[in-house]
Amino acid sequence: MSDFNLVGVIRVMPTDPDVNLDELEEKLKKVIPEKYGLAKVEREPIAFGLVALKFYVLGRDEEGYSFDEVAEKFEEVENVESAEVETVSRI
């Protein structure tokens, strides 16, 4: 983890409130490219029973790292409505 100097927060919205979040979280973890790390995943209640997953993805401030790349990978996963990079910060 010491090689990483950025953290990007990516909010993933499931397609509906009935999606099994545990299964979705595991599927999403598997599509994160190897060069990135994962600090943690949080759940954020939105409305009407819908809960977003917030992935804290670790990367480097150098060419070849883009948190948008990870968000695009997330959007390809079944039961994902959207994935959006909320913030990127230095660590």
Curated annotation (Swiss-Prot):
Disulfide bonds: none annotated. SMART domains: EF1_GNE (SM00888). InterPro entries: eEF-1beta-like_sf (IPR036219), EF1B_bsu/dsu_GNE (IPR014038), Transl_elong_EF1B/ribsomal_bS6 (IPR014717), Transl_elong_EF1B_B_arc (IPR004542). Keywords: Elongation factor, Protein biosynthesis. It comes from the Archaea. Pfam families: EF1_GNE. The keyword Protein biosynthesis applies. GO terms for molecular function: translation elongation factor activity. Signal peptide: none annotated. Promotes the exchange of GDP for GTP in EF-1-alpha/GDP, thus allowing the regeneration of EF-1-alpha/GTP that could then be used to form the ternary complex EF-1-alpha/GTP/AAtRNA. Belongs to the EF-1-beta/EF-1-delta family. This is Elongation factor 1-beta. It comes from Pyrococcus horikoshii (strain ATCC 700860 / DSM 12428 / JCM 9974 / NBRC 100139 / OT-3). The gene is ef1b.
